[in-house]
């Protein structure tokens, strides 16, 4: 499925995007976001700047730059929140814009040892708590 960039939440930076996540910062070829739903404490997303459907559409140089951004964010998440593992999800079945979900997993936390849920809808924070998480991530980038 290929979507129109004019209808893409990442390209249009629309209200749907802002309802789901908060932009942390721009990176070299992408943007980092904090998911508002925080069942997986510290969950982030990295979205490629250009409207491409899949990792295999990028040149080697573009792919390496994007994956360096993803790695940079996961390293910051590891330092900020100390999860046991970070799960990577790149599905794009219904939203054809290259992005990676980054879900920290904790031994005693939800779905440890299994696949993370896309949007469990259970844990939402205050603006102050979101800002604190964002600052922790930024300080480790």
Predicted regions and their residues:
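HIT superfamily nucleotide-processing domains
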Residues: 1-141
């Amino acid at each position: 499925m290929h979507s129109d960039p004019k209808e893409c939440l990442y390209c249009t930076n629309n209200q749907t995007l802002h309802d789901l996540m908060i932009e942390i910062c721009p990176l070299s070829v992408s943007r980092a976001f904090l998911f508002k739903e925080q069942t997986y404490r510290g969950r982030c997303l990295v979205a490629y700047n250009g409207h491409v459907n899949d990792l295999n559409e990028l040149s080697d140089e573009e792919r390496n730059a994007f994956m360096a951004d993803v790695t940079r964010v996961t390293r910051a998440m590891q330092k900020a929140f100390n999860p046991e593992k970070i799960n990577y999800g790149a599905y794009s079945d219904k939203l054809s814009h290259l992005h990676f979900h980054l879900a920290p997993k904790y031994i005693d936390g939800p779905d440890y040892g299994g696949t993370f849920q896309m949007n469990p809808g259970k844990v939402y924070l205050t603006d102050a708590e979101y800002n604190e998480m964002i600052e922790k991530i930024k300080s480790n980038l």
